[in-house]
Structure formats: C-alpha cells, structure tokens
Amino acid sequence: MKNHNQYNGGIADVWYSGDKADLWIEYKFEVLPKRDDTIVPIDLSPLQREWLTGRHAEGRSVGVVVGCREGGVWFPGTTGCGAGLPVKSFRGLLITRIELADLIRRSVSS
C-alpha cells in the first residue's frame, strides 16, 4: 500500500503485508555520480529516520531501498538511516529490480 499522509510526516513510502510478515519501505532514487569515491546519499528526513527507527524498535520489519537506473540497494532495518556510501561500495551492493522485488516478496510471503 502506497502511503501519503499530509498530516503525519515521516511515514514510510510503502507498506507490504503478507502471510509471513509486514514490511515498511522508504524508497529513494539517485543518479549515481561518475567518481567511485563520491558519496551516494541516503536522504532521509529527520521525521523519516525517526519513524523508521521507532517502528524498528517496536519489532516491525522496516528498510530503505536506494534505487538508481541500474537497480537498487536494500538497507534492512535501520541500516539505511546512515549517511551514505561511496559509489564503488554502492555498486558492489547493487541488485536488479527483479531481485529487489523477489527480496520483498520473500520477506513477507511464505
């Protein structure tokens, strides 16, 4: 379910519900810089960080996907609440959109 609440900021972009678990994901999209040492930001707002950290502390499954033209990187739990990664490291973690979709499906469904 795509979420948008103009009265309560910070809620994750999408909520997935399955027979195994629920999963809240915040999506970010970046154009990757050309230089390997340039940092790919994880631009979460303070409210987004607070919301994800709070739900994670409650035992809920949360994560951040930083997408780009080539695919995306999955940051489970609150690991996506950091400052970012150098392009070279980001590319090393990059998976395809199909792999991301399968990861999400396996996280919520038996």
Each language-model region and where it sits:
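Histidine- and/or cysteine-centered catalytic micro-motif in compact active-site loops
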Residues: 3-5, 28-30, 67
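A short acidic, often aromatic-flanked loop/helix-cap motif at beta-alpha or helix-coil junctions
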Residues: 6-10, 71-72, 95, 100
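Phosphate/NTP-binding elements of NTP-utilizing enzymes
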Residues: 10, 22, 29, 50, ...
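Conserved catalytic cores of phosphodiester-cleaving nucleases, focusing on short active-site segments
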Residues: 14-16, 20-33
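Mg2+/Mn2+-dependent nuclease catalytic core
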Residues: 30-51
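Nucleic-acid nuclease catalytic cores
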Residues: 53-82
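Charged phosphate-binding loop/patch that engages nucleotide di/tri-phosphates or the phosphate backbone
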Residues: 88-110
